[in-house]
Curated annotation (Swiss-Prot):
The lineage of its organism: Bacteria, Bacillati, Bacillota, Bacilli, Bacillales. This is Spore coat protein GerQ. It is found in: Spore coat. Residues 30-57 have a biased composition (Low complexity). It comes from the Bacteria. Residues 19-89 are annotated as: Disordered. Multimer. Is cross-linked by Tgl and YabG into an insoluble high-molecular-mass complex that appears very late in sporulation. Residues 58-73 have a biased composition (Gly residues). It comes from Bacillus subtilis (strain 168). GO terms for biological process: sporulation resulting in formation of a cellular spore. Its main location: other. GO terms for cellular component: spore wall. The keyword Nuclease does not apply. InterPro entries: Spore_coat_GerQ (IPR014099).
């Protein structure tokens, strides 16, 4: 039975590969100006004349993934940059005119909701009529004013919605930005 190589012996096998220079640690792809950062983390960049000296250093010069050798990266804390998720009262957030947001703007209005239930022998397609109470990313809640029944409808089955009155929809066109081509 052949004895298993330890990590140091495996790394020596890599050193013998012509032109191969392993770089392990937090960032295996150092960018410009990170050479000094590698040395502060207990790593030394390999140069052709240092390859022979590597055997004397043992595992000290290598940092394996999952092992931290002092130093390290810190994730900056503080406020996150504002983006398209910012909302203005009475308006939809920039580039977020999703169906649930439009339905929220029209809460309290009567709507007719057309849905198709594929692979259903009972229903196929069905029409729901009621007052919009709430809407989420994947659902719509309406109530039938005549019967008092509330329906929780999944938007995956939604085809389209009609309203008997004007739809409240204010899209912030002036805030939309397009990158030049």
């Amino acid at each position: 039975m052949k004895p298993k190589k330890n990590q140091y012996q495996q790394m020596q096998a890599f050193d013998n590969m012509q032109g191969y220079q392993p770089q392990f640690g937090a960032n295996p792809y150092p960018q410009q100006g990170q050479g000094s950062q590698m040395q502060t983390m207990g790593m030394q960049p390999m140069m052709p004349m240092q390859q022979g000296q590597q055997g004397q250093q043992g595992q000290q010069g290598f940092g394996f993934p999952g092992q931290q050798q002092g130093g390290g990266f810190q994730i900056p804390s503080g406020p996150t940059p504002s983006g398209p998720g910012q909302s203005v009262p009475g308006m939809l957030p920039v580039e977020e005119s999703y169906i649930e947001n439009i339905l929220r703007l029209n809460r309290g209005k009567t709507a007719t909701i057309y849905m198709t239930f594929e692979n259903s022998k009972e229903w196929g397609s069905k029409i729901f009529r009621g007052v919009i109470e709430a809407a989420g990313r994947d659902h719509i809640i309406i109530s039938d004013p005549k019967s008092g029944t509330r329906y929780l409808l999944l938007t995956i089955y939604l085809d389209y919605i009609t309203f008997d009155e004007e739809i409240a929809y204010t899209y912030p066109y002036s805030m939309a930005s397009y990158s030049p081509r």
